[in-house]
Swiss-Prot record:
Biological source species: Burkholderia thailandensis (strain ATCC 700388 / DSM 13276 / CCUG 48851 / CIP 106301 / E264)
Gene: miaA
SUPFAM superfamilies, A to Z: P-loop containing nucleoside triphosphate hydrolases
Family indicated by similarity: Belongs to the IPP transferase family.
Name of the protein in its database record: tRNA dimethylallyltransferase
Catalytic activity: adenosine(37) in tRNA + dimethylallyl diphosphate = N(6)-dimethylallyladenosine(37) in tRNA + diphosphate
Gene3D superfamilies according to UniProt: 1.10.20.140, P-loop containing nucleotide triphosphate hydrolases
HAMAP family: IPP_trans
Assembly: Monomer.
GO molecular function annotations of the record: ATP binding; tRNA dimethylallyltransferase activity
EC number: 2.5.1.75
Residues annotated as site: Interaction with substrate tRNA: 108, 130
Keywords assigned: ATP-binding, Magnesium, Nucleotide-binding, Transferase, tRNA processing
Protein residues bound to substrate: 19-24
Required cofactor names: Mg(2+)
Length: 324
């Protein structure tokens, strides 16, 4: 990179990590030292009214440090990686224009990938097509639509379970709107624009040296959520007539398990066990994404001084003391 190009590129520090790795503590510790504003990279925190089960920053924390892309979507509505990318780029520019420092923080790696690498040229959702597919699924069942998908896009069908309604619907929708298999569109180079050309994203990753430590934290945090009234939170959502388990919001970790408990499908102990297991599986997927990211700066989230180490790494990024 030439000196002139380097001067025109703004470095954006990114604090990434799996569930319960200490991202919030590190971000708030950095905020005590620098004029930062936190931009959430979390697909669950976007939903209003879903506070306990998403471990949303408290009102006090959000009052102390500006947070963005939290509580921006109703649980009945959809929010996409494309929407996140547009919102995040806009917010980062607005923060910089105020003379403050944006810090991206979260664990939704698909959002981070969309932001930093661009998007594939997939069509937007079409309500009419979705309504047609929903009607067909109600009549024939999702396994029948999965078989239909296999006939037009075998690669996508092979990686989806026959009852994965959301993804089967999306893959068929893409095919019906474009005439091309979604697998072919995803294999094409991502479409990038100039919106992120002036930004250099540098990830600092909180990762465990001992997964057992992280698993213990996950269990303790889930129990704390239950003590804080998580079941009551889900019951309030369940009483709404526009929410159901097929929505992306209700598939957030913990919410499906609590909903099924309230429906009488499971007992309390099974709900707790399944909620913790689902969170551990999410953690595993997050770590898989992170470890495929070669340029990241790794901080052991199990270390006693993990917060201080993360803050030091982020400050080195912000001060330009990392390789370009």
């Amino acid at each position: 990179m030439s000196e002139s190009n380097a001067a025109s590129v703004r470095t954006v520090a990114c604090l990434l990590g799996p569930t319960a790795s200490g991202k919030t503590a590190a971000a708030l510790a950095l905020a005590a030292r620098r004029p930062i504003e936190i931009v959430s990279v979390d697909s669950a925190l976007v939903y209003r009214g879903m506070d306990i089960g998403t471990a949303k920053p408290t009102r006090e924390e959000r009052a102390a440090v500006p947070h963005h892309l939290i509580d921006i979507v109703d649980p009945a509505d959809a929010y996409s990686a494309a929407g996140f990318r547009a919102d995040a780029l806009r917010v980062v520019a607005e923060i910089a224009a105020r003379g403050r420092t944006p810090l991206l923080a979260g664990g939704t790696m698909l959002y981070y990938k969309a932001l930093t690498q661009g998007l594939n040229d997939l069509p937007a959702a079409d309500p009419d097509v979705r309504a047609t597919l929903d009607a067909e699924a109600a009549r024939d069942g999702w396994p029948a639509l999965h078989a239909r998908l296999a006939s037009v896009d075998p690669a996508t069908a092979a990686r989806l379970a026959p009852n994965d309604a959301q993804r089967i619907q999306r893959a068929l929708e893409v095919y019906l709107l474009t005439g091309r298999p979604m697998s072919a569109l995803l294999a094409a180079p991502p479409r990038n624009d100039d919106a992120a050309a002036g930004l250099r994203f540098v990830p600092v990753a909180l990762e465990p040296s001992d997964r057992a430590v992280l698993h213990a934290r996950i269990a303790a945090r889930f129990d704390a959520m239950l003590e804080a009234g998580f079941i009551d939170e889900v019951e309030r959502l369940r009483r709404r007539d526009d929410l159901h388990l097929g929505l992306p919001s209700m598939r957030c970790v913990g919410y499906r398990q609590a909903w099924e408990y309230l429906e009488g499908v499971t007992d309390y102990r099974m709900m707790r066990d399944k909620g913790i297991f689902a969170t551990r599986q999410l953690c595993k997927r997050q770590l898989t994404w992170l470890r495929a990211m070669p340029a990241r700066i790794v901080v052991d989230c199990c270390a006693q001084d993990a917060t201080a180490r993360a803050v030091d790494a982020l400050e080195r990024v912000l001060d330009g003391r990392t390789p370009a």
